[in-house]
Regions:
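Glycine-centered flexibility sites
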Residues: 45, 58, 64, 71, ...
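Charged, low-complexity, helix/coiled-coil-prone segments
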Residues: 27-49, 73-88, 111, 143-158, ...
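Conserved catalytic cores of soluble enzyme domains
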Residues: 115-245, 249, 253
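Charged, alpha-helix-enriched surfaces in structured cytosolic catalytic cores
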Residues: 24-31, 55, 92-95, 130, ...
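Intrinsically disordered, low-complexity segments enriched in small/flexible residues
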Residues: 1-67, 71-74, 86, 230, ...
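Glycine-rich beta-alpha loop segments
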Residues: 35-39, 51, 57, 63-114, ...
């Protein structure tokens, strides 16, 4: 199949779902922080190299509970997108996330992760500063942290860059989000040697979170009224807030050792 071939209806539909998840007006992590949480205090830096604005985080109030919020921020316009590196974290972003997870554990705060990235940043500098190790350490930290964790796929959950903040006790997703092993363009370039075959790759990836929900990788889908969260942000964020409060309250009732055992079994059995 050449790059000029017409995509099938199935392929077109699959990539249309990706394009909807990438809509520039969808609610971002900072919108959710502002509308779903109270008294958020941002903490910056990884205490090793610097601060990565693609990852934001700090303690906040969610209902009656103090939580640690960690999010991947994309921005909505050219200025904020550049500021936040289009939501693609560097190693220092993941190290900042690990630092905040350890603080949450120390002070007994549940963790809420807001996932929204096409992938971790793949630049030379990021690789030289240990991108693979930073992602691996975040995966380990999420699996081992001794406090309840909830992750939310807001729009794009791409590759290990998303998974590094998504190995939670509960995983929620906005209805029109995507959650996939790689962006369709990257997958097409690898498998077909042609990034233009992104629609074909999208169909193979089955990126919609409904698929992840069917597989048990996502626990709850947050409904988005037509045409999507970009047109109904306040409604969707209010629904997300209610779901977060409910899941965190449920998780806090479990003995910590039982919670950690469930988390380990959940991810050991993933895909089985």
């Amino acid at each position: 199949m050449s790059s000029t071939a017409v995509a099938t209806a199935r392929e077109q539909a699959a990539f249309a779902a990706v394009e909807l998840a990438r809509h520039p007006d969808r609610p971002r992590a900072l919108h959710v922080v502002a509308q779903a949480f109270d008294d958020w205090t941002e903490l910056r830096g990884d205490r090793f190299y610097g601060d990565d604005r693609a990852v934001i985080g700090g303690p906040a109030r969610l209902g009656d509970t103090t939580v640690m919020v960690i999010g991947q921020e994309k921005g909505n316009d050219p200025m904020t997108r550049a500021l936040h590196n289009f939501g693609m974290p560097h190693p220092e972003g993941y190290r900042k996330a690990q630092r905040l997870m350890r603080q949450a554990e120390k002070f007994g705060m549940p963790i809420v992760c807001l996932v929204d990235t096409p992938a971790a940043y793949a630049g030379v500098g990021a690789e030289e500063r240990g991108q693979a190790w930073a992602i691996a350490a975040s995966l380990l930290c999420m699996l081992a942290v001794r406090t309840p964790t909830v992750s939310v796929i807001l729009s794009e959950g791409g590759s290990g860059g998303a998974l590094a903040l998504a190995l939670a006790d509960r995983v929620l997703a906005l209805e029109n989000a995507v959650y996939t092993v790689a962006p369709p363009e990257t997958c097409a370039a690898i498998l077909y040697r042609d990034a233009a075959q992104r629609a074909r790759a999208a169909a193979a990836l089955r990126p919609g979170v409904d698929t992840a929900h069917e597989l048990g990788l996502v626990d709850e889908l947050i409904p988005e009224p037509y045409p999507g969260a970009h047109a109904h942000a306040e409604f969707v964020i209010a629904a997300l807030r209610g779901a977060l409060i409910r899941h965190i309250n449920e998780l806090r009732e479990l003995p910590l050792d039982a919670l950690l055992a469930q988390r380990r079994e959940r991810y050991r059995g993933a895909g089985g």
